[in-house]
Structures are given as structure tokens and as C-alpha cells.
Amino acid sequence: MAHRGPPSAPKRPGPTAPDRSFQALLPPCWPRSWPLLLLLLVLVAACGAMGRSPQPGRQGPGVQITRLLPAGRTESGDRKDPQARESEPSVPGLGPGSASGPSTDGAPAPGKGRRARAVPVAGAASASRAQVSLISTSFVLKGDATHNQAMVHWTGENSSVILILTKYYHADMGKVLESSLWRSSDFGTTYTKLTLQPGVTTVIDNFYICPANKRKIILVSSSLGDREQSLFLSTDEGATFQKYPVPFLVEMLLFHPKEEDKVLAYTKDSKLYVSSDLGKKWTLLQERVTKDHVFWAVSGVDDDPNLVHVEAQDLSGGYRYYTCLIYNCSAQPHIAPFSGPIDRGSLTVQDEYIFLKATSTNRTKYYVSYRRSDFVLMKLPKYALPKDLQIISTDEQQVFVAVQEWNQVDTYNLYQSDLRGVRYSLVLENVRSSRQAEENVVIDILEVRGVKGVFLANQKVDGKVTTVITYNKGRDWDYLRPPSTDMNGKPTNCQPPDCYLHLHLRWADNPYVSGTVHTKDTAPGLIMGAGNLGSQLVEYKEEMYITSDCGHTWRQVFEEEHHVLYLDHGGVIAAIKDTSIPLKILKFSVDEGHTWSTHNFTSTSVFVDGLLSEPGDETLVMTVFGHISFRSDWELVKVDFRPSFPRQCGEDDYSSWDLTDLQGDHCIMGQQRSYRKRKSTSWCVKGRSFTSALTSRVCKCRDSDFLCDYGFERSSSSESTANKCSANFWFNPLSPPEDCVLGQTYTSSLGYRKVVSNVCEGGVDLQQSPVQLQCPLQAPRGLQVSIRGEAVAVRPREDVLFVVRQEQGDVLTTKYQVDLGDGFKAMYVNLTLTGEPIRHHYESPGIYRVSVRAENMAGHDEAVLFVQVNSPLQALYLEVVPVIGVNQEVNLTAVLLPLNPNLTVFYWWIGHSLQPLLSLDNSVTTKFTDAGDVRVTVQAACGNSVLQDSRLVRVLDQFQVVPLRFSRELDTFNPNTPEWREDVGLVVTRLLSKETSIPEELLVTVVKPGLPTIADLYVLLPLPRPTRKRSLTSDKRLAAVQQALNSHRISFILRGGLRILVELRDTDTGPQRPGGSGGYWAVVVLFVIGLFAVGAFILYKFKRKRPGRTVYAQMHNEKEQEMTSPVSHSEDAQSTMQGNHSGVVLSINSREMHSYLVG
């Protein structure tokens, strides 16, 4: 389980000589709180396409730029014939001309500016709009022509300082060989190259900016031999630096988010150090630390700001989650908030939540801690069976996760949590995903910034990718409405439901750049992205579309993708074409993309590597980074829009717009929200103090403010039931929670819960009057005894830690009788409550039967563990028919998951016998000579690996079997796991009992392995009474079952409201067993009215004629005849037969019997 942030770039081999065709390495993991955010722009040499920035136009604090040699370009490229290098056509909708720069060829002298006047769209602008005036200033970083990477930091916050670090990174050596540090104090008009050590060559690998005080900067330098490193510290935005040596090799630094002088250092040998004086002195905190899994305390959540969360390797080689305070980490032992080992790289600390995962016996479990409480299992739908889980969002006290379920390959399902992040409900299926370098996963979902609750996602169904949008955090999703006309005013002929707008959210071929959808917190409702119109998303189509009302209406603005930058809270939109050829045209809009103008930001076409503005998008100054040719120096062009906006905006310069969804509903997330935007006729600056949110009004609650609670699914059968939530077949809402204590009460869910961040009040309350139930005294259930480490084979005299767990039932009043099999017996209380293991060791080799019996006034449970004591498989499941007849052969099958290709020995224990049956096959056949409950236990041993499972079998004299089948749709949702089959059987039993009033203990439904999904229903007879040899009640029960099945009244709900029908199965269509030694036998018995004695005599003779096969026939009534007919059953699961009657009961009429006899 990992966070969704951009991964580190892989190292690629490069030439030994200086070359710019290197793949940049993204700097170490940068938390969201860091001001130095790196923008990696990759120019892909293979295809000649310019890479896209992680967030094009992302104001920075820091940007890393890599320039590569595009296809078709020569290294000798120079500034000759710029017109030949740029032949960008005029864009429809743009002005008929552009403001021209100096007519002389070549770049201006450093710091020399040019003033230009942009021409707007003809007929679309007022007279004042023709006065757009921009100032472009170009500066060349002389002497850095060989440098192939650049990192940029714009301090912001009323500061005019910009720092640029250029460096030559050698891919083969994996290190920086040359570097230059440049500083500007006038918003990028001029730059000064800094000399850190006069007369000494200094190589800077990286620099880090303190988020709590951006004036404080740390440079990390190294010698060419990588044998020593130094830090250069500045407290005045890089005006001066002081050098301090460090006794280790720095891999990454991590500033404290609130306290400006505290910083963590992760070293190349996986050690973690801390400094409280801005890197002057260091203290070792922890060794064997996992990279990128170190976290400072979260303000407002962790009690002490000096706390550090760490994932580290312990002495045994496993990984643990530790916390410690930086002042006494070495003096006191570390605290382990999670008791057991965790998976490497799984620890994530994010806002109020901590996530981790732990895998044992080939099963992965995901845990969450809310506000540093105890870790609990994340409750996904029972049969989601996740293969992977990615954290999408944790804001607004709610968790969004993407889960790849057992039957998914390149898609994930999106789930939304409750407040504590424990219980999850499905909100969107089949979100497209791609796995990138270093096994990082990219999920095609994007949170629209600036408007809470709005998400875009690309859904992949049947190979088609379509874009959907939600305004209420996933409760409802809609397609994007297409514009009626294109950018030239021509009809698009795109009509729903056959045609919609689809957007590229993320690019699968480059994980180090962001998607092409641009949103900003400072510009709510403004979304600009690349995509196409049609029935699905087309990868090679990158037309640019924009919306200024948060996705309600869209307009096409360009035919090709552009780099986009928002300035002054979206008051100005700047765009530069994303292309591999040099250019000099900047397009911009001052009216939210309705009209566009062009500006020549430089006289000579340049290869654009990136765009940057001051952090916060609050100014009207931007910088274009590029280079004239492959061997030229870096060129920075400052574009200043401030002359066009001479005054600060006032209240009369704004108009308001109301947020609505695609249905025109104003109440979104429980409130009506209005925002301010600048009027198109107002030429003014919004400024730093501008706030877009205008008003909000709380709405009354409606059905649409609620979604289905955990364990429930929304029906999709009809519009009238579209908002109805029904319990899933595996979920019983009346069952008390596992932590329900006697004397307390619990709330039974009605199937609905309000979205956590929804603020509606009054109105409809689907959660009203929840059922308050008293916690009953629960009998112990799910009792387990195991050896810590999940093994059942140990060495003699080795300490063994027995762990007893109880999944359900009261623990305070339960007593536990423990027998370790070698003479040690003891009685415990609170054994499962304390979690303390039982320490023991065995002196002699052998097999020991360890048993634990838990008992209270409500009932008891027993767990058995056979311990093999020798010197020390994975998942094991024992499949056995739960009901069998006396002296009837039954097949016991041990299912190993995964199947072990090596030789495996199976040990079978039946009853309390200590002498097992041994087999090399995973199945054995046996008989039970006496009626009663018999426990069957199997162990699978392969080398020193031993696992076991146990089942209870009911051995009876008489019972009846009814074959069942299900709707074909169930096969699609059948993961073919024993637990799934067991749950389906339980729900069928419960439904039949409710419909027929037959006690559940007299009905047992067994779902068979494999496809198609079929089952057998076992109808048990009541206990025999001395005064009656035969009970007519059994006939009535059977008739009631048949009537309920024939009338199609037995069904249950699957995901999406799919209803599964349970019916009688035609035994002729069931799977056949080759050989037929253990199946049902076809026998027809005629019940002749008035000739009962003759019928009984015939039955008796038939039974005597076929020894070893018994038939039981019952008289039903005069209007209906019954016959019993055993038929052959499937190879993969033993269908049981009763001792004195056959395994299938069929009710037929005279015509059916005649057809059967004749056929």
C-alpha cells in the first residue's frame, strides 16, 4: 500500500562524454508541505515530443528541468534562420497579429527588456482590451551550456528572489559533475552567479527550502569522489552562505513543517539523523530505515511536534513501525504502535491517518489508525479480495482509496471511507490505471482543486476509456457534456449519449509528469485540459478545452496541447504550445479563455523547457525556461503582465457565479456556494488578498446527500429504486460488532450514511431512528490457536509462543482451558483480551495435540492445533461435506493456496485420534461408523512448513438432499474460494429458513467448487421420537422448500443491485463423475394408491438386489408422488448421500414419471 505521489525516476545509461540526452532523476520524496516542489520537464528523444510538466505552470518553489535532444535536431543548431525553425500556424480564434519584439535577430543582452503590445481576437474585445501591454526580459545563464538539469526556486510571499541551480548530471556515474547557482532579486530580470568558495570548485547536488521560513536554505555539496559532503546554510534567501561539514553522505533532507531549524537527514547507508540548529550538528536517530517512509509529527494530531514516525528493519530482518522523540531516541527504546511486522514500504502517515499493511500466510491485511488510536483492519467489502490498495486522498477527514480487486488487471475500484477511515463503500468501479517505472501505479483520477468534492476520473469498461465527473465526492457520476461548437464556431455534431467530452488525466508513458488537466486552488471553477470528443478517449488526440463554471459548460480553445499557467488567481491564462520544435509565441487570455491574444516573448525561437510563476499564482509575472539550441546556454525569459493592469480591483469589478452540477442543482455537498470572478470589462489586479469564495448557504438534506453504508449496495434495477441501499449477501446488519461488550448498546445500520464533508441540515434523514440494540452475551466464535510466526513445526527445546485469538464473543466472562498435549494443562481468563502469548517448549520430538476450549454462559468454542516438533505451505482449506450418512463414504479434500509444486505430505486426523492418516494426495476417502459430530483436521507439510485446517462434520442416519442452481450471472462474481462458497450457502440457508419457517439448524446449503455455480441443500430430519417411526412433518418441510424454490421467492442481491435467483437444479445437467462410484443412483419407485404393501415389497426387493446402496422412499400425499433418485456428482466436490435414503428428492407428476420410464 503506497501514497499516490510521483515516484523517483529510474536511472538510465548515458554516454560517458557530456551529453544532454539524459533522463532526469526526480529529487527525493518531497512531502506536500515542502515549498520546494520540483517540476520535471522531459524531452523524449525517441519520439521527439516535449515532455509535460508534473503540473504545467505549477508555481514553484522549485522546479527541476531536464532538456534532451529532440529527434531530428543536430547538435550544431544555432540561431540562424529562426523563421525556418518556427512555422507555427495561426490559431483560429487568436488575434490576427501579435506584438512583435525587436526586429534584430538574436537574444537581447542580459537584462535588456522589450515592451510589446498584444493584439486581441478581432471583434471580440472592447477598445480597452486593445491596450494589452507586456514586458519581456531575457537573460542567458552564461557558461552552463553543458548542464542538462536545472532546479528553480521562487521564494514568493512578497519576495522578488529567484534561485536557479543548473547542473550536469552524469547518468552512468549517477552523480552531479558540475553545477552553478544563480540568484535574482528583481523577479528574474537579472541573475548573479554565486561563488560559494572563492578559488575552490564547488559541486551542488541539491538544495532544500524550509517551509516554515523560506528565507532559510540548505545546499548539499559533494566532492567528485563522493567521499565527503558539506552543507551550505543560508538564512537570508541565499544572499550569504556558511559551510558546515557533515559526517555522512546525504541522500535527502526533510525539514520540519512548522519548526524552521529542525531537519531530518536520510543517508545513503539508510541511517536517519536529526538536527535542531539548521544542520550544524547532527544526532543519530535510527538505522536500517526505509527510504521515503520517514515522517514528522502532524500538527494538531500528534501530541508532541518532536515526534518522528519511522519504518525500519529490525534485527530479525522484518520491518516495523517505530515512533520516537528526537531528543531521547537513542536513550530510550523506540515505541512500536503496531505490534507485529509490516510489509516493507507500506507505512504512510497522512493527515489524521496512518496506513500500513501486513502479510502473513500469503494473506495481506490493511490497517488504519485514526488520530493515533489503535490500528484496526480496514473493512472493505468481504469479497473485494484486494490485490493492491492505493491511498488517493485523506482531506476533509475522509479517506479515498483505489483498490485493485481479485478479478481486475488494469483497473481499480474507488472506495470512500467513514470518518475513522475504517469502513469503506464503493463509489466508482473500473478506474483506469497503469503501472510505471519502479512498479509505481498511476490511477486515472484527479481532484479538482478550488472546489471541494469535485473529482474527474477515467473509467475503463470493455476496453473503452471515458471521462466522468462527480460533484459530491463520488456519490453520483456524470459524463462531461460536449460543446455544441468547436473553436471555429462550427457545429461539433457531438450528441449524448453517443458522444461526450473526454480528457487525459494522466499519461501512461511518463510517470514523472502530471496529466493535462489544470486546476488551481486560487482559481475555483477554472479547468483546462486536453482531450477529444467522441464515444471514448483517444490517446493521440490532444485538443484543448476549458470551463470556467467547474465543468458545467466547456469550450474548445486550441487544436493541440499547450503548457498552461494561471496568473493572478486565474485572471490571466498563459499558454505555450507543447511541441518539440522551437517557438516564440505566447498565447494568453484575460477573460477565462473566451478570447485569446498572442505575444512574441522572445525575438528568437527557443526550445521551451518549462513555465514558472510565483508560488500561489498571485502575481502577474511569469518565467519561460528554454534554450536556443542543443549546445546553447539556458535562457530565461521574464514576461510581465503588470503594465496591462494598472490598479487594484474593487468590489464593483467582480461578478458572481453559482456552483451547479450537470443537472443544474445548486445544493452540492449540502450547501449552495457562490464565487466571485472579475468582470471581462475590468482591467485590474485581484492581488494577494483576493478571496474567490463569496457566500454559502446550508441546504436541507435530501436522498442524494446519503450514500450506501458499509455492507450495502445501491440498487440499479429501476429509477424508482435507484437510491435504495440493500444489504449485500455476506452482510448481516443486525449482527453485533466484534467489539460489542455485554451491557453496552450498538446501532444497527439502516443502510445509509451521509458523506462525511456534507453539511446539509434538517430535511430527509435516511439515518433517522437507527435500531439501538443491547449487546448480548455472545458465545465465543472463531477461536484460533496458533504459534507466533504462523508456523506449526518447531524444534525441540525451542521457545514456542502460543497465541489464542477469538474473532467474536464475549471475552470478559469467558474461561479458556488450555491443553498443550505434553501434560501441561491450565485455565486462563482474559486470555484473548490481553493478547499475551503462552510461552512453552517441548523436550522431545513428536506430534502434540494442543487444544483450547473457550466457554461462557452463552456457549463454547474449541480450537485445535497439532504441533510437529522437529527442526521447522501457505493457505490451506479443508473442504468436506458438512453432513454425511453413517457408513457412507465421504471425500476429504485439502485445498492449498497457492498449489505447492513440490512434494507435500498430508496428515489427516478424524475425531480425537492422535494417529493420523498419511497421504501424498490432497484427498482421502473415509467412513463414519457412528452418528454424531466428528471433527476432521488436516495438516499439509512440505519441508519445515506446516499448515492446518479443521472442520466439524455431522454424521446422521437420515436426511434429504435437494439440488440447487443459481442465475448464470453469479458465475461472474465467483472467485472460487471456499469462504465465498460458504457465505453463499449461509445466505441461501437463511433465506429458505425465513421463507419456509424451517429452523436454520435443519437446513444446510453446500456450494460446490468450480463453474457453473451449483449447490446441494441438505434437509435434516428432526430428532427421532419414541412414539413415532416416521414424521409427516418432513414431507411438509420438503414441499415447502420446493414450493419456495419453484415460485422464485429465494434470491439475494449482489453488487450493483444484481439479483441472483436460486432454483431447483435439473440433475441431468449437473457435472458427471467419471466412474460413478460415489454419485447419486437413479432409482424410480412407484407409489401405487391403495397398493402400499406391494410398493413396499418392491422397494425392499430392489434394495436387497443392490447391496451397499440404500434407498429411502416416502409417501407424500394422494395428489403428488415422490421418487428418490441418486445421480452421479461432480469430481471436484463430494455430494453426500444419506444412510437410509438417496441424495436427491424430486417431486414429479404422472406424465413426468411416464416420460422418465419410457426415456
Curated annotation (Swiss-Prot):
GO terms for cellular component: cytosol; dendritic spine; early endosome membrane; perikaryon; plasma membrane; postsynaptic density; postsynaptic density membrane; recycling endosome membrane. N-glycosylated. The chain crosses the membrane at residues 1079-1099. It comes from Mus musculus. It holds the Pfam family Sortilin_C. InterPro entries: Ig-like_fold, PKD_dom, PKD_dom_sf, Sortilin_C, Sortilin_N, VPS10, VPS10-sortilin, WD40/YVTN_repeat-like_dom_sf. Detected in Purkinje cells and pyramidal neurons in brain cortex, cerebellum, dentate gyrus, striatum and hippocampus, and in glia cells in dorsal root ganglia (DRG). Not detected in neurons from the dorsal root ganglia. Detected in hair cells and supporting cells in the organ of Corti, utricuar maculae and cristae (at protein level). Detected in brain, lung and testis. Detected in the inner ear in neonates. Residues 52-120 are annotated as: Disordered. This is VPS10 domain-containing receptor SorCS2. It comes from the Eukaryota. The heterodimer formed by NGFR and SORCS2 functions as receptor for the precursor forms of NGF (proNGF) and BDNF (proBDNF). ProNGF and proBDNF binding both promote axon growth cone collapse (in vitro). Plays a role in the regulation of dendritic spine density in hippocampus neurons. Required for normal neurite branching and extension in response to BDNF. Plays a role in BDNF-dependent hippocampal synaptic plasticity. Together with NGFR and NTRK2, is required both for BDNF-mediated synaptic long-term depression and long-term potentiation.
